[in-house]
Amino acid sequence: MPSAVVEEKINSYRPRVVERLASAGEMLAARQEMGGNTPGNVPPWPGSSDADFHGSLAAVWVWSRAQQVLGDDRFSLNIASAWNFIESSWAEFIPRTLGAHASDEAAYDCAMVLRAWLAGGAHSIDDESARREHVVQAARLLGAYITDLDDLTGREFKDPGFLVWTLGDYARASNDRGLGATARRFVEAAFGMKSPPPFASEMPVRDGLFDFSCTTATRVLAVIGAEGPIPFVGAWLRERVASALPQAFVPRPMDENTWNACAAATLGYAFSVATDTTFFDAYKSLMDELDLRAEVGSLGRTTGFSGETSATFYYAMATASILGKI
């Protein structure tokens, strides 16, 4: 497709992206704790005071992306406070190794450290800073975890697609060839370049507490993360992935808003790489429904739930993805 047509479609969404990210940022800023025992923490839902490590990192991602599209620094205090919370509570959430003793969420926590760092332009921070040391530690832990990962059936916090996608993006941004090779080896062995199954055929979680990650979508993101948004990957998306895209919002018994937002984030980003209207049309179909379900930039896990930090993060990713920012 001619680049002018692609730009026209992307730019048609730009005002909506600015509005949604600004609203999501304001909601999360209002939720953030600025005093008490955990200053800087962003609790997972209204009325909660739980310390939420990856939720606070998700908020950093939203605020950072919002500032980029707004062209100002209105959330800079929120970002700094959230990073202070992350650094002060690091030992509580991030173990020395991601072995059997680590929590089920530890690998995801490491990945979210990297996603927040990537979104915020924090790679300009001095390599000797404590934050940079924590980012490097999270990357090394995640790389070792992925190297030893045999179970490809993980969902939610253990979704290998999300973890490898994040590691690949980080490796490219930090020019870490070793971690980049780790991501590529995993993708080649676990996923390859075969056609994924239809997104809508993905089985729901039956016995868990969450079903927020569309693992078919994150597998696609893992390939893009490992290889980069290059023409070869664009051809793969057009030839092998386009036929698997959902044609409408996919009903799910649990976390259907977040699951569809995860899928939409992949479709929007893939459109910027593949430049094929099949991806744009599928993206628009999901986003039209998600926009109806969202309230002032905030999204609940499913119908009837109030705005939740994680669901809002995935909705914000979906919103921004059409600009190639994810």
Model-derived regions: residue spans:
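Terminal, non-catalytic domain-edge segments
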Residues: 1-27, 47, 65, 69, ...
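Glycine- and aromatic-rich loop/turn segments at beta-sheet edges
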Residues: 21-50, 84-106, 134-161, 179, ...
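Non-membrane alpha-helical segments in proteins
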Residues: 48-69, 109-119
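Residue-level detector of extended alpha-helical repeat arrays and alpha-solenoid scaffolds
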Residues: 56, 76, 110, 160, ...
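Short, charged, amphipathic alpha-helical segments
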Residues: 76, 80, 181-184, 284
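The feature captures the catalytic groove of carbohydrate-active enzymes
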Residues: 112-129, 136, 150-154, 158-172, ...
